[in-house]
Amino acid sequence: MTQIKAIIPAGRHALYEKHGYSAAIQSKDLLFVSGQVGSLQNGSPEIDYEKQVELAFENLGNTLEAAGCTFEDIIDVTTFHTDPENQLDLMMKVKNTIFKEPPYSAWTAVGVNWLAGFDFEIKVIARLPSDSN
């Protein structure tokens, strides 16, 4: 059986226990991060879209950090958008403050009808640095 390790950032255990999943799973040198949203500490969505995207990236950063990774270790990104035509420019503005220069990861953006009250979600796959394994 493949050895896996659950990664849950500090202060977020109740959220993941309530819904029965892990923030991320480490399998060998890969980290599979569950969809991160712009949730406030109480789990509710940030109302302002740009702030929601910023908070989703912050939550993603906390999950990566808990596993010993950074944004530079990300190799694949999937983002979900409830209104991509009107949201993509703001999302790209935030994204470009985090992913500033090549090489950029692979990226797929998907338009969806529903995200449980959220308007943006991001999931990634990262390769753990060799000193984190």
Predicted regions and their residues:
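N-terminal presequence-like segments and the immediate start of the first folded domain
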Residues: M1-E58, N62-I75, H81-N133
